[in-house]
Amino acid sequence: MYPLKVRITATSGIAAMSINGSTIDWLLDKRYESEKKKGNDRNYSRVENINKRLGDASLIIIDEVSMMGCSKFKELDAMLKKAKNCDLPFGGLDILLCGDFAQLPAVKQTSLHDALVQSTQTYIAPDDHVMAAATLLAKFRKFELITLKRSKRLYQTERTSP
């Protein structure tokens, strides 16, 4: 058996810090866009930087998925395909989405949860980002974990303490 190489990410800096990971924007080298606007992109390879940041990871964990919008999800897929030179979804890497869709939504983008809802409703005409995200999400297997509530944990702690 070989050790699994994992890149841990989150959609926000605070979430990334709490899990000792990085942000999706850092992984996708979003600095490239600002460098391009400044005209400093001549010797700059976004794909090369993404590959360096991925290392030999075969699994990317994304926490706080409720805050990921459809266009960023589509960009993640496109950039990983380029970086890995592979037309499979996400460049052939495994993606583990974590989080609660009932938490904070994506900022200025349609959330992944809304993409799933819109793709199943015939009276809504989703845009390209929404359709792309819904198509990618359809390839995922869904697992629901038991919900732990603070009051339950607190109660259990009180009952078990001496």
Whereabouts are the PLM-identified features?
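Conserved ATP-binding/catalytic motifs of P-loop helicase motor domains
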Residues: 1-162
